[in-house]
From Swiss-Prot:
Subcellular location per the Swiss-Prot or TrEMBL entry: Cytoplasm
Organism: Ectopseudomonas mendocina (strain ymp)
Keywords: Cytoplasm, Fatty acid biosynthesis, Fatty acid metabolism, Isomerase, Lipid biosynthesis, Lipid metabolism, Lyase
Keyword Lipid metabolism: yes
Purpose of the protein: Necessary for the introduction of cis unsaturation into fatty acids. Catalyzes the dehydration of (3R)-3-hydroxydecanoyl-ACP to E-(2)-decenoyl-ACP and then its isomerization to Z-(3)-decenoyl-ACP. Can catalyze the dehydratase reaction for beta-hydroxyacyl-ACPs with saturated chain lengths up to 16:0, being most active on intermediate chain length.
Pathway: Lipid metabolism; fatty acid biosynthesis
Chief location bin: cytoplasm
EC number: 4.2.1.59, 5.3.3.14
Name of the protein in its database record: 3-hydroxydecanoyl-[acyl-carrier-protein] dehydratase
Assembly with partners or alone: Homodimer.
NCBIfam families xrefs: fabA, PRK05174.1
Length: 171
């Protein structure tokens, strides 16, 4: 795989099918759980910690599946989907670095929600700041992240942790 610094929706769908990083390696979830339409920037340098960053986007429209069921008469994107998107991006970063294994979210430190995504919104932006990657017997990414809607930050998470596992038998 040739590393790029940006990825289209088609690239991300290929990743969900296991075609981007190779069989048995990091995959994004398929729609409807794929919470990213494009990665506009990915780099091993930069970010708040100087160790890498990812900027990704999700286009919002009122027909997205979660608005019809969360909540009836009060549609809002579930906050856990934004948190999951940040984990998805940390796992993508580890695969993009060339690390082997399947991604699993392993937790996070403090998570704060101080806004919401409504069906009238246009775009969600995810900003991931890599703090550390461990590439030994365990492949682990640790990052801080934020979610913004139409330019306004609405969620933050510290210490997002994702591991890559060549075997999940004992997981």
């Amino acid at each position: 795989m040739t590393r790029q610094n940006a990825y289209t929706r088609e690239d991300l769908l290929a990743c969900s099918r296991g075609e981007l990083f190779g069989p048995g390696n990091a995959q994004l979830p398929a729609p409807n759980m794929l919470m990213i339409d494009r990665i506009v920037h990915i780099s091993e340098t930069g970010g708040k910690h100087g160790k890498g960053e990812i900027v990704a986007e999700l286009d919002i429209n009122p027909d997205l599946w979660f608005f019809s069921c969360h909540f009836e008469g009060d549609p809002v994107m579930p906050g856990c989907l934004g948190l999951d998107a940040m984990w998805q991006l940390v796992g993508f970063y580890l695969g993009w670095q060339g690390n082997p294994g399947r991604g699993r979210a392993l937790g996070s430190g403090e998570v704060k929600f101080f806004g919401q995504v409504l069906p009238t919104a246009k775009k969600v932006t995810y900003n991931i700041h890599i703090k550390r990657t461990i590439n030994r017997s365990l492949i682990l990414g640790i990052a801080d992240g934020s979610v913004s809607v139409d330019g306004r930050e609405i969620y933050s998470a510290e210490g997002l942790r994702v591991g890559l596992f060549t075997s999940t038998d004992s997981f």
